[in-house]
């Protein structure tokens, strides 16, 4: 039976019912709806709507229902109830009879669903934070194991300067740390309870909403009933967090797809996260990474869709807001799955050090070192830049790296170049000189690993 049937003399068209019903997706809020109902029953005792004995009966029945839901959540989908609130109330009435009809006193589905969704978001944020830190930890461990793996760093997808695989790993640790911070900030803002705001104007019962918020584990109660039932900022924030986080994971995936390619050959992925071809027996495809990259788009779409849904809504609640859940559920599920999968990809990855080092020695990645050498000899940087550019052209013409050019050839471009230039052009020197904080020098990378381990309690 619908919760609102008294006003109507005709039954809803079955096509409208299917269009209107939300149980097929909001069943995921069942546990939160039951927990919220237990807290509401306690609040009704404080204003004399329920006796202590009635509340006890309701709480016992709701707790039984909670265990039934946890044991078999799919049972909910066998119902033709309109939404999860209708389903919970119907099941409660089945268990306690007419007493169950008293529970909704002073409460609206508007503040009820807003509360349920915030409770769900809080739990999901904690899961995301755990998965995020697990991936950070996996990156730090991979970095620690590959501090000596020298590889080319890229700009414009062209070899630029030598870095290490460890330094690359730590770059993504930084991105994930920002994702973690955003989630923590979002959690602070959504940690306010809308329960007790009614449909839009507040409840007619003098319920202590701060006490009610505390029972539900919220930091406080919201301040304005109109805003409370129509606020979906936390949905937008979480979708934004997910969109940014998935961009980071997509870039991570793209880097490793390239590193794993035959053209680069810097890493080999485990068989556990790759697949083959139905036609070409030799193929070993990085499907896990490609799916992470591909799933980024659906999360961006969820954020854009929700913004467009909310942008023209008048205060307060509108049924448009029912559209908040499917996109949110899918986006956060996707982000969580991708965090877990990225960590799995790192488990068993093999870094091919000789190939990485060979690539780092190609492409004149030490050209900047020669320019810095000239600057140290008193040549203005802009002039040094031009000199080195000419030297690179000559090295390309001869088919040699810079460090293989004879001194006489180098001195054609600048007489200040001496025998002391050759140690400067080594890969190790290139790394050692980047010793400022955040640089790629072995000492800085080791310090960054230690700092990350301390922050993550590894």
Curated annotation (Swiss-Prot):
Gene Ontology CC: one annotated term: cytosol
Main location: cytoplasm
PROSITE patterns, per the entry: FUMARATE_LYASES
Pathway in which this enzyme or protein is active: Amino-acid biosynthesis; L-arginine biosynthesis; L-arginine from L-ornithine and carbamoyl phosphate: step 3/3
Localization, UniProt: Cytoplasm
Reactions listed under catalytic activity: 2-(N(omega)-L-arginino)succinate = fumarate + L-arginine
InterPro entries listed in its UniProt record: Arg_succ_lyase_C, Argininosuccinate_lyase, Fumarase/histidase_N, Fumarate_lyase_CS, Fumarate_lyase_fam, Fumarate_lyase_N, L-Aspartase-like
Protein name from the UniProt record: Argininosuccinate lyase
Organism in which the protein naturally occurs: Salmonella newport (strain SL254)
GN (gene name): argH
């Amino acid at each position: 039976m619908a919760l609102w049937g008294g006003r109507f003399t005709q039954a809803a068209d079955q096509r409208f019912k299917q269009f209107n019903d939300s149980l097929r997706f909001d069943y995921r809020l069942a546990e939160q709806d039951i927990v919220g109902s237990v807290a509401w029953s306690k609040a009704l005792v404080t204003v004399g709507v329920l006796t202590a004995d009635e509340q006890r009966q309701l709480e016992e029945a709701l707790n039984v229902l909670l265990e039934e839901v946890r044991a078999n959540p799919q049972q909910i989908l066998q119902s033709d109830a309109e939404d999860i609130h209708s389903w919970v109330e119907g099941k409660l009435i089945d268990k306690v009879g007419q007493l169950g009809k008293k529970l909704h006193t002073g409460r609206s589905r508007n503040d009820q669903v807003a509360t349920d969704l915030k409770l769900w978001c809080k739990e999901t944020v904690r899961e995301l934070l755990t998965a995020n830190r697990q991936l950070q930890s996996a990156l730090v461990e991979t970095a620690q194991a590959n501090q000596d793996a020298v590889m080319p760093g890229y700009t414009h997808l062209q070899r630029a300067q030598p870095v290490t695989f460890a330094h690359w790993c730590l770059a993504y640790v930084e991105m994930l740390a920002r994702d973690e911070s955003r989630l923590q900030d979002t959690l602070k803002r959504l940690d306010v309870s809308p329960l007790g705001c009614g449909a839009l104007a507040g409840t007619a019962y003098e319920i202590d909403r701060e006490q009610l918020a505390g029972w539900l584990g919220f930091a406080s109660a919201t301040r304005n009933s109109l805003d409370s039932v129509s606020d979906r900022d936390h949905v937008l924030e979480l979708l934004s967090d997910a969109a940014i986080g998935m961009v980071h994971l997509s870039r991570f995936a793209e880097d490793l797809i390239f590193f794993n390619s035959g053209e680069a050959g810097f890493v080999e992925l485990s068989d556990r996260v790759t697949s083959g071809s139905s036609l070409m027996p030799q193929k070993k495809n990085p499907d896990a990474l490609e799916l992470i990259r591909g799933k980024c788009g659906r999360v961006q779409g969820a954020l854009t869709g929700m913004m467009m849904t909310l942008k023209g809504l008048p205060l307060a609640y509108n049924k448009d807001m029912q559209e908040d859940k499917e996109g949110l559920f899918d986006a956060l599920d996707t982000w969580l799955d991708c965090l877990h999968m990225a960590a799995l990809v790192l488990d068993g990855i093999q870094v091919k050090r000789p190939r990485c080092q060979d690539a780092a020695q190609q492409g004149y990645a030490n050209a900047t070192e020669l320019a810095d050498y000239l600057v140290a000899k008193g040549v203005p940087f802009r002039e040094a830049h031009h000199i080195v550019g000419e030297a690179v052209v000559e090295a390309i013409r001869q088919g040699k790296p810079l460090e293989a050019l004879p001194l006489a050839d180098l001195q054609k471009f600048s007489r200040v170049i001496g025998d002391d230039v050759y140690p400067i052009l080594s890969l190790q020197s290139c790394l050692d000189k980047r010793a400022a904080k955040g640089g790629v020098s072995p000492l800085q990378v080791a310090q960054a690993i230690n700092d990350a381990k301390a922050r993550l309690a590894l």
